[in-house]
Design a protein with these regions (language model features):
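Substrate/ligand-engaging "lid" and interaction regions
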Residues: 1-417
């Protein structure tokens, strides 16, 4: 039976992962995407529903064309009903929005669009059941999206929704980005996203994506390459407190040394410094917390995981810019986010986190450069909010204050720290 895939949002993860894999599978008759930027919609239509993705492999670049895409603007009165019909008939849907906060934004919001499509599904039993992949970078994205959709339905519809629709979390360790400078697109021989355009989407060649186990009766995924896990949380933590934490640490410290591209770290003493943080601080804490859950959380497998990720992080063909990696330091200094969250996890497991404290200190310095009259404590209060229940807050802030002193010498020598 021919399947339909619908994407909500059209950034690099949607275009370079979900739609790309759906197209490559050959299992979908229809590929549909929702995009609110009129110029993008018009450009894709002029390209007859096709776009290009540049894939950074270990040995070079390769381009892939995705064709047959239907693109609709939910803000357009003519497009919205076509999009709702596609949602109602879709077997697989992926949301790939900037953050979970976008679920309820816009008129209509993504949650409202999904609810309207699912309402039709509930009324017509011949329409297929649906899996919704929540690709936003939040460990509870699927639950938040489900709640946002349920809020748009009446009580009777809510009771029936779980029988027809399953929202699943995702662990997406795929690095991606948009190259906006036409000179860089030309210099690196990248294929523009749209044939007539000047921007290019560049993603790494990686599709080992983890998802929750599918529990809908008789459901067969069209995107077959994803791997199902009964308990996704340990792997979500491995990504956030391992992959994301080490990537941020490398980025913030590379910025202190005025490095432009992440692959330039490969020839410096910063790389082994980050490797030790990834192995000992992230790995030590995560392997203790999740011992026995999966082979990943053993010293041998974790070391292989670290080696693979560091190699991918410094892939020169990915052309990953340091300023992209360190964007939005306020979010990355969040209480549960990659830097502070990893430090807290290490404290919980009675381990040190001096290297991640240095990365957090570098992120703090970026913020204080624009807010010079603010103390570190006040800065974190503005990021974290009320501190009454945060028993580790003083210890965390103390480690970062100490790391700020060490950071002054970091530009000269990494190994002495």
């Amino acid at each position: 039976m021919a399947k339909t895939f619908v994407g909500i949002g059209f950034g690099p993860i949607q275009s370079g992962l979900f739609l790309l894999e759906a197209f490559a599978s050959g299992n979908f008759e229809r590929l549909v995407v929702a995009e609110v930027v009129p110029e993008v919609v018009a450009s894709v239509r002029r390209s007859r529903g096709s776009y290009w993705i540049n894939l950074a492999e270990a040995g070079g670049l390769r381009s892939r064309k995705v064709a047959g895409l239907e693109i609709y603007n939910p803000l357009d009165a003519e497009d919205e009903p076509k999009l709702l019909a596609a949602i109602a008939s879709a077997e697989e849907i992926a949301t790939a929005l900037p953050s979970v906060e976008f679920y309820d934004r816009g008129t209509p919001s993504p949650a409202r669009l999904l609810a309207s499509g699912f309402r039709r599904k509930l009324l017509h039993r011949e329409l297929p059941s649906t899996v919704v992949y929540a690709a936003e970078n939040d460990n509870h994205a699927a639950e938040l999206l489900r709640d946002a959709v349920r809020a748009q339905l009446d009580p009777a519809e809510r009771l029936r929704l779980d029988d027809r629709v399953q929202f699943v979390n995702t662990v997406i360790g795929k690095m991606s980005g948009v190259v906006s400078d036409p000179l860089l697109v030309q210099r690196d021989s990248l294929v523009p996203f749209i044939e007539e355009g000047h921007q290019a989407v560049l993603v790494e060649e990686f599709n080992r994506i983890l998802i929750n186990r599918i529990e809908l009766d008789g459901f067969e995924r069209g995107i077959e390459v994803f791997q199902e896990k009964s308990d996704l949380l340990p792997f979500e933590e491995a990504k956030l407190y391992g992959h994301n934490a080490a990537h941020a640490l490398m980025g913030y410290l590379a910025n202190r040394r005025h490095v432009t591209y992440m692959h330039e770290v490969s020839s410096s003493d910063l790389l082994p410094f980050v490797e030790q943080a990834f192995l000992e601080e992230s790995g030590g804490a995560l392997c203790r917390r999740h011992a026995g859950v999966d082979a990943l959380f053993t010293n041998t497998c974790w070391a292989k995981y670290v080696d693979d990720l560091l190699t991918r992080m410094i892939n020169p063909y990915l052309r990953d810019r340091v300023d992209r990696v360190i964007r939005d330091p306020r979010r990355k200094l969040g209480w549960n986010d990659r830097l502070i969250g990893t430090m807290r996890l290490a404290l919980e497991q009675k381990l040190g986190s001096r290297r991640y404290a240095l990365g957090a200190a570098a992120a703090v310095e970026l913020l204080l450069a624009t807010e010079p009259n603010q103390s570190v404590s006040k800065l974190f209060e503005s990021i974290w909010g009320s501190s009454e229940t945060r028993v580790d807050q003083h210890a965390i802030v103390g480690q970062i204050e100490k790391a700020r002193e060490e950071l002054r010498d970091f530009a000269r020598k990494c190994n002495s720290i």
